[in-house]
Amino acid sequence: MTRATVTKGSGNVFRDLGFSEEKSAELILKSSLLQALQETIKDRGWKQVEAAARLSIDQAKVSKLLAGQMAGFSIERLVNFLSLLGQDVEVTVRKAPRGRQIGTVRARTTRKLAKIAG
């Protein structure tokens, strides 16, 4: 029987996949924004056509967003989409702890915000 080798991850799936620190930070943020967008659309029970109308994009783009395809959508555009759907998006910048030269990127979503009817 063959034994599987398990390597502990770093906690950052994109770094573990070989992306650079900069690209990894971008992908973490984009994926969190995308998840919040997906949850908002799902929680409101909208069909893709209705979400497309509210976001002023075509249904095919909504389909890509709901399928998790981030390519072609900038962080700025995802933030704008969330705003159009009545979501507040906050960005906090603070100095990295002493001894760490490179800062980290974290994103949190508050599910309660996504559940506001609209």
Language-model features and meaning:
Residues 33-50:
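Short basic helix-loop element that most often maps to the first helix and adjoining turn
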